[in-house]
Amino acid sequence: MGGCPSISNQQSTMTSSRFRGVVLLSGGMDSCVCAALAARDHEAAAVHVSYGQRTEQREKQSFLGICERLKIRHRLIVRNEALGMIGGSALTDNSIPVPTAENVGQSVPVTYVPFRNAHFLAVAISWAEVLGAEKVYIGAVEPDSSGYPDCRPAYYRAFNEVARTGTKEGKIEIVTPLIAMRKAEIVRLGLELGAPFDLTWSCYSREDAACGVCDSCVLRLRAFTAAGAHDPISYAVK
């Protein structure tokens, strides 16, 4: 049926309660650090949602590579066709140009995918319920971000109430360990954890070399500079 999520690459359908953490892993810098935290504290399971975004294949490659490096064996890749069909974002509609960081402005940018994180969380919470996991990790960040409304603390407080009231046992908690951190702090934390930044992908528009000019690339480059660290991925413009 058109628009329904499809699921692939699930290495295990185990329902063991030892999977205490499910982490949403896009393949970007923030989600990579979040995954490193989850893998440190739990036997984690990782879920990746593809939704027809411009860099879909590159992000999926990053997801698999990060899982290998962090030794996360239990993985779920879900394709959500609905977000691509709905459109309304430069990430899913090729007729809408991806703006450079200097042209983003003060309002919510066109790279915002409408209510995207709700789709992601629904998948992760459902899987957590099957696995018996009690925590769902997501690398949402409010400071030094593009200003997306689904990256605010109030959003996750509300979604935690949804998870509490809408699951069988009501014990699943959405965890946002990075939400109040500056990007440079996230880089430093990732380096301490051994997060594989070399495998991550943040660019909104390109899959060969990161463009270096979209909002996501610029925020990432500034973060590494502020942290006094080297960004290990390649850029077309730096």
Residue ranges and their predicted role:
Residues R206-E207, A227-K238:
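Short cysteine/histidine-rich metal-coordination sites, predominantly Zn2+-binding motifs
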Residues T167, T225-G228:
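Short amphipathic alpha-helical interaction/hinge segments
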Residues S12-G194:
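ATP-dependent adenylation/nucleotidyltransferase module used to activate substrates
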Residues P5-S6, A90-L91, D231:
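Polar low-complexity intrinsically disordered regions enriched in Ser/Thr and small residues
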Residues T100, A195, R222-A226:
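A polyampholytic, Gly/Pro-enriched intrinsically disordered region
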Residues M1-G2, S6-S17:
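Short, basic, low-complexity termini and linkers enriched in Ser/Thr/Gly/Pro
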Residues I172, D198-C203:
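Acidic interhelical loop/turn segments
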Residues A122, W201-R222:
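Local cysteine-cluster metal-coordination motifs and their immediate loop/turn environment
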